[in-house]
């Protein structure tokens, strides 16, 4: 655990008692803070009591006694309207921050205390609309394979303050969501990665411009930034940072760049003043299939280069990466049919890489639709043999598909798996794919995308060989 000592003897309000909230409370308490925690969900309050964390309804506390509100990233800060606890903190004129900010301040204190520089305890922060978890996991994997002391956490699922404490040469690889960045005003990573920017979480940010601005804060604060230049918003941001004198390099999975990193098919290159150097070839790596994974690998390799880390066995290290659960995860193969779990694809842009990577697709899609639905995926419709529509979005998606290809109103995931398996087994193509890439949030039928993905795996494993 990373203990937070700079609130020692001071009273701190904490709201949000999920896994990261509980960990944050323990980190504050271990550092001597007087913590009062609360959550609108009774199960969170019960969890706090089980861990001996003081939990009282913050609506009835004297807010003039608090010096800060530590807020869970899932709690509305601004849009669609501030949560009542945010209003309370603003009325009391106290700072509102999250666990990433606590980590940043604790690291800064450690560096100052021991006279270390930024590079002595590298902090790599990774963000983007899609792909950030894979890039985070891949980078941490490569560092581990090469024998480095690495800690991985943040939005990827491991609460950042549960990581091992700071020591010299320990490397922190941290995934950051836009909500977490909003709550981290001092965020200044050693290296900042921005993978892509497409509309997402607009209900929480109010507009795409506000969403972009949140992501921008991560790379503008970085000592060294790498920005993908394959979408319009990132291109604008890259040029802006370059003009402002930031140390920033371009990364592209689609085209050559004069200075930076790019992919030519499965081959990855670094480029300096127009001269290129081959870094790796992903051709035989199943877990890194698709152009989106070329981008993820480029970002990881760019980071290693910035850290001045080289290894002659890089292809071997890349090949040993097994991929993330629920992200283009091969669950089973029955004859020529692959069953792919891509439950983490919670919007159309996140589904695009899987649709691009495969052919002869029997597509299970649907859930709670995001803005614009699957309209942006029309360019992949020629690859789809049939779709199986589930959840609240089924009727909307049926309208978008129209007569482009056959579809079934399966409604439930269990129905969809059985129907898709039967149809796919009849297909005579060399490789056939039952692809569960919902392009939707899970909340209409499942608690989260992980539970949804586990349900898919369970249904697939129950299928009987024919």
UniProtKB/Swiss-Prot annotation:
Sequence intervals crossing the membrane? none
Taxonomy, superkingdom: Bacteria
Q: List the disulfide bonds.
A: none
> Which terms under GO biological process does the entry name?
cell division; cell wall organization; peptidoglycan biosynthetic process; regulation of cell shape
Tell me the InterPro entries matching this sequence.
Answer: Folylpolyglutamate_synth_CS, Mur-like_cat_sf, Mur_ligase_C_dom_sf, Mur_ligase_cen, MurD
Query: What EC number is given for this enzyme?
Result: 6.3.2.9
State where the protein is found.
Cytoplasm
Residues that bind ATP: 128-134
Which cellular components does GO assign to this protein? Answer: cytoplasm
Reaction(s) catalysed by this chain, per the record, are:
UDP-N-acetyl-alpha-D-muramoyl-L-alanine + D-glutamate + ATP = UDP-N-acetyl-alpha-D-muramoyl-L-alanyl-D-glutamate + ADP + phosphate + H(+)
Q: Which UniProt keywords apply?
A: ATP-binding, Cell cycle, Cell division, Cell shape, Cell wall biogenesis/degradation, Cytoplasm, Ligase, Nucleotide-binding, Peptidoglycan synthesis
Which leading EC class covers this enzyme?
Answer: ligase
Q: Where is this protein chiefly located?
A: cytoplasm
Q: Report the family membership.
A: Belongs to the MurCDEF family.
Q: What does this protein do?
A: Cell wall formation. Catalyzes the addition of glutamate to the nucleotide precursor UDP-N-acetylmuramoyl-L-alanine (UMA).
Q: PANTHER family per the record?
A: UDP-N-ACETYLMURAMOYLALANINE--D-GLUTAMATE LIGASE
Q: Which NCBIfam families match?
A: murD
Q: What is the name listed in the Swiss-Prot or TrEMBL entry for this protein?
A: UDP-N-acetylmuramoylalanine--D-glutamate ligase
Tell me which species this is from. Answer: Bartonella henselae (strain ATCC 49882 / DSM 28221 / CCUG 30454 / Houston 1)
């Amino acid at each position: 655990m990373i203990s937070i000592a700079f609130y020692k003897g001071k009273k701190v309000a904490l709201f949000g008692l999920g896994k990261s909230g509980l960990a944050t409370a323990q980190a504050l308490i271990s550092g001597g803070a007087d913590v009062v925690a609360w959550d609108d969900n009774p199960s969170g309050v019960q969890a706090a009591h089980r861990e001996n964390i003081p939990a009282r309804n913050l609506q009835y506390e004297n807010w003039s006694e608090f010096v800060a509100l530590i807020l869970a990233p899932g709690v509305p800060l601004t849009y669609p309207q501030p949560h009542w606890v945010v209003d309370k903190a603003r009325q009391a004129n106290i700072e509102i921050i999250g666990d990433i900010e606590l980590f940043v301040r604790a690291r800064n204190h450690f560096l100052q205390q021991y006279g270390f520089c930024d590079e002595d305890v590298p902090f790599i922060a990774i963000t983007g609309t899609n792909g950030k978890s894979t890039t985070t996991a891949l980078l941490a994997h490569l560092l581990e394979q090469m024998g480095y002391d690495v800690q991985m956490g943040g939005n990827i699922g491991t609460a950042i303050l549960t990581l091992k404490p700071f020591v010299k040469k320990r490397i922190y690889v941290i995934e950051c969501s836009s909500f977490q960045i909003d709550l981290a005003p001092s965020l200044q990573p050693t290296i900042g990665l921005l993978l892509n920017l497409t509309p997402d979480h607009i209900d929480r940010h109010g507009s795409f411009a506000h969403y972009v601005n949140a992501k921008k804060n991560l790379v503008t604060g970085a000592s060294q930034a790498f920005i993908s230049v394959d979408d319009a918003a990132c291109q604008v941001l890259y040029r802006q940072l370059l003009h402002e004198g930031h140390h920033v390099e371009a990364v592209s999975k689609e085209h050559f760049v004069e200075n930076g990193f790019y992919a030519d098919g499965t081959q990855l290159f670094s480029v300096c003043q127009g001269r290129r150097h081959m870094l790796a070839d992903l051709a035989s790596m199943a877990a890194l299939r698709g152009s989106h994974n070329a981008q993820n690998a480029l970002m990881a390799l760019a980071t290693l280069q910035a850290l001045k880390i080289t290894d002659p066995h890089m292809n071997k290290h890349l090949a040993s990466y097994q991929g993330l659960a629920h992200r283009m995860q091969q669950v089973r193969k029955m004859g020529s049919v692959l069953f792919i779990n891509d439950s983490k694809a919670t919007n159309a842009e996140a589904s695009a890489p899987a649709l691009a990577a495969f052919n002869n697709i029997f597509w299970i899609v649907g859930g709670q639709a995001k803005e614009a639905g699957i309209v942006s995926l029309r360019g992949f419709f020629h690859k789809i043999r049939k779709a199986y529509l589930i959840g609240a979005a089924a009727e909307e998606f049926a309208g978008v598909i129209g007569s482009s290809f056959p579809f079934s109103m399966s409604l439930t995931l269990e129905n969809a798996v059985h129907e898709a398996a039967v149809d796919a087994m009849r297909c005579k193509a060399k490789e056939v794919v039952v692809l569960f890439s919902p392009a939707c949030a899970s909340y209409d039928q499942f608690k989260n995308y992980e539970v949804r993905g586990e349900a898919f795996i369970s249904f697939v494993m129950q299928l009987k060989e024919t």
